[in-house]
Amino acid sequence: MAKKRPLALLILDGWGYSEDTQDNAVFHANTPVLDKLNAQYPHSLISGSGIDVGLPDGQMGNSEVGHINIGSGRIVYQELTRISKAIADHEFEQNAALCDAVDKAIAANGAVHIMGLLSAGGVHSHEEHIEAMCRMAVERGATKVYLHAFLDGRDTPPRSAKNSLVHFDELFASLGHGRTASIIGRYFAMDRDNRWDRVSQAYELITEAKGKFTYASAPEALEAAYARDENDEFVAASAIVDAQGEAAVLSDNDSLIFMNFRADRARQITRTFVNPDFDGFKRNKTPKINFVMLTDYAADINAPVAYPSSDLVNTLGETLQNLDKTQLRISETEKYAHVTFFFNGGKEEPFEGEDRILIQSPKVATYDLQPEMSSTELTDKLVAAIESTKYDVIICNYPNGDMVGHSGNFDAAVKACEAVDACIGRVVEALAKVDGECLITADHGNAEKMKDPSNGQAFTAHTSNLVPFVYVGRDAVIKDGGRLSDIAPTMLTLMGQSIPKEMSGRCIIDLKE
């Protein structure tokens, strides 16, 4: 087999750029490798947020959006934008899957349960979408409407859920029907790393009202959680009862509508409700329900979808397949879906010639406890893959900046950045030995802003800052004004290949030779 000259793309998750050095873990980290690369090779800053990635203007980027834009080589208009537009255009209340779920529950004298991340963060969901669903259910005649609120504190300030919970109490009062039936932190309900002990707590809360606590109102439950020193993300399972002390549990003939639009943290809990042979934990109750996913969460989940995804053709992965090129996707479990499913435009199956390596993320409660995560093991596998000269293209995601940045722990985020920098050194060295090249970038910012100057709280969300773009290869100039969708066309050009017409991005590297 002929040896390959690999082109590697290293995605440093959550690694943005900011002139503000205060509470900036990226700035304060000791990163001799990246410092040297920036001094020796062409580099620039590119956009990974807002309208440049198909989000509303000013909206921070996120990992799903970033990887879809990088992998598809075009601006992909995101579900947040698409669903918000449907609501504004009054198309949402006519959505066939949503209407059918509400109507079936009403006809069977059942309840309409609505679950999702109650957040204005706009990363996994938006509370405006949840409000529209509550309104639509009542307007179609549902009198039993129950909200199961997953609390954020990760893409929003750590203690910011109160206004949302109060607003929904007021909303239900104005509608004359419905109430909040439970609250729980996203740490439990939205796990994506097969920690079924967490997900089971959310499942039992919704199906049995089995929580650690019971309260008469959601704001009261939140206040008690704060008194226990639980931020929104970690709020323990709390059932909310009505004036008669009755809980609302998911029962036969009810409908359950999941209002998250992002797939990766929606899959696990969805499977607990819809997979008859689910075995992640023992389910005490398995009610026969009508379940609706807001968007496609996974190809193997058999449930109606309110907003099916549009097909993206000639993504980078598909183009490499058509060119008979070999490719490797590698990351830890936390970002594995991003370098595979999302990078491939929502396609689960690997392309011909595409290999995948999954490294288990550490089993710790939060990643500030192990800021290096599994970066050493990941880099061991990556270096071996480079040395094998088996691959034309390698896509790797280092999750540390994002996953540790979300903890709000500045010192840990600094250590995370330093760990990644050391790994990059090993990768660049391995590539040099096989005459390979490397692009280094990020999908969005996070670790460069670890404190919110407006309130002094830890800043755990993403940012809309520009992200780095470094080319470790031939003598070249990088054009200004780049964005994530320019990366795939640039990679194909570096490989001497033409850019598919479906890719609206442009090559932003001019080779001097």
Curated annotation (Swiss-Prot):
Subunit comment: Monomer.
Organism encoding this protein: Shewanella frigidimarina (strain NCIMB 400)
Function (record text): Catalyzes the interconversion of 2-phosphoglycerate and 3-phosphoglycerate.
Binding residue positions for Mn(2+) 2: 13, 63, 443-444
Any Gene Ontology biological process: glucose catabolic process
Keywords linked to the UniProt accession: Glycolysis, Isomerase, Manganese, Metal-binding
UniProt KW GTP-binding keyword: no
Record-given protein name: 2,3-bisphosphoglycerate-independent phosphoglycerate mutase
Reaction(s) catalysed by this chain's protein: (2R)-2-phosphoglycerate = (2R)-3-phosphoglycerate
Enzyme Commission identifier(s): 5.4.2.12
Cofactor binding annotation: Binds 2 manganese ions per subunit.
Cofactor: Mn(2+)
GO cellular component assignments: cytosol
Main EC class the enzyme belongs to: isomerase
UniProt similarity note: Belongs to the BPG-independent phosphoglycerate mutase family.
Pfam families to which the protein is assigned, alphabetical: iPGM_N (PF06415), Metalloenzyme (PF01676)
Pathway, per record: Carbohydrate degradation; glycolysis; pyruvate from D-glyceraldehyde 3-phosphate: step 3/5
